[in-house]
Regions:
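Non-catalytic terminal extensions that flank enzyme cores
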Residues: 1-4
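Divalent metal-dependent catalytic cores for phosphoryl transfer on phosphate-bearing substrates
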Residues: 6-14, 31-131
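N-terminal glycine-rich anion-binding loops that anchor highly charged ligand groups
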Residues: 22
């Protein structure tokens, strides 16, 4: 798995200053929650900094990644990066950063949530909403 500095730099290069600052705030909040709920702070830090890596992709980039990684998007997700970025971001993190399945799920569901979320998923979900 890539280290924090490598992921930080890669995410920073792909996002606007405003979106990157949001990722920093989300990370800080998520680490606070990780301390409270006994989750791995380093893992949380990596997930949170990378959670929006796909948020500002162009439609062309989305199409390319969907084809490359065989990502299923429904019709609404295809037209709305606000919904699809979490799925696409999870796949980017899996293949480019070597995130494990648990980390990828936290990214995949950080926008919509889901039933029976793990503590890690909840931390990222809430930190994103409040960060």
């Amino acid at each position: 798995m890539k280290n924090y500095e490598e992921i930080y730099n890669e995410v920073k290069s792909r996002l606007s200053e405003k979106r990157f600052n949001h990722s920093i705030c989300t990370m800080q909040r998520a680490v606070e929650y990780a301390k409270i709920y006994g989750e791995d702070e380093e893992k949380v830090k990596l997930i949170a900094i990378a959670h929006d890596i796909a948020k500002e992709l162009s439609k062309e980039d989305v199409k390319e990644l969907v084809e490359k990684y065989k990502i299923y998007l429904d019709d609404v997700e295809k037209e709305n990066i606000a919904l699809s970025h979490s799925k696409i971001g999870a796949v980017i993190c899996k293949y480019e950063f070597e995130f494990d399945e648990e980390m990828c799920k936290a990214i995949a569901f950080h926008t919509t949530g889901r039933e029976n979320m793990s503590t890690l998923e909840k931390i990222i979900f809430v930190a994103d909403a409040t960060g």
